[in-house]
From Swiss-Prot:
Domain of life: Eukaryota
Localization annotation: Secreted
Example of a GO cellular component annotation carried by this entry: extracellular exosome
Family of this protein: Belongs to the intercrine beta (chemokine CC) family.
GO process terms (BP): antimicrobial humoral immune response mediated by antimicrobial peptide; cell chemotaxis; cellular response to lipopolysaccharide; chemotaxis; inflammatory response; negative regulation of leukocyte tethering or rolling; neutrophil chemotaxis; positive regulation of cell-matrix adhesion
SUPFAM superfamilies from the UniProt entry: Interleukin 8-like chemokines
Protein name from the UniProt record: C-C motif chemokine 28
Feature: compositional bias, Basic residues: 92-115
Region annotation (Disordered) ranges: 92-127
Signal peptide: 1-19
Cystine pairings recorded for this chain: 30-58, 31-73
Summary of the function given for this chain in its UniProt record: Chemotactic activity for resting CD4, CD8 T-cells and eosinophils. Binds to CCR3 and CCR10 and induces calcium mobilization in a dose-dependent manner.
Gene Ontology MF terms: chemokine activity; CXCR chemokine receptor binding
Amino acid sequence: MQQRGLAIVALAVCAALHASEAILPIASSCCTEVSHHISRRLLERVNMCRIQRADGDCDLAAVILHVKRRRICVSPHNHTVKQWMKVQAAKKNGKGNVCHRKKHHGKRNSNRAHQGKHETYGHKTPY
């Protein structure tokens, strides 16, 4: 009889954990700080970029630049980055966005009782 009770409790715990996964946020890779300075020389080596919005999934607006195997988070208000994005858009003849918006993989808990661990990609550039 005790084994049957333990099995029922274990099953209930598994069901509760499975249901709570839909409520808890999926850990995302948001920038937690941004660099306000970036060199034009570094911008020449950018492979791709993404735009991170401060929309509830991430707390900070940023432009994420991918340089080799690094991600560099830069302020979207940075004048040098804005100019670079205009030049890149002109090179593409205005077709499509230079930097794509970051895709979100789920909704966050509205009361933010549990927050996923954010990865820090905010690098201060030595340039």
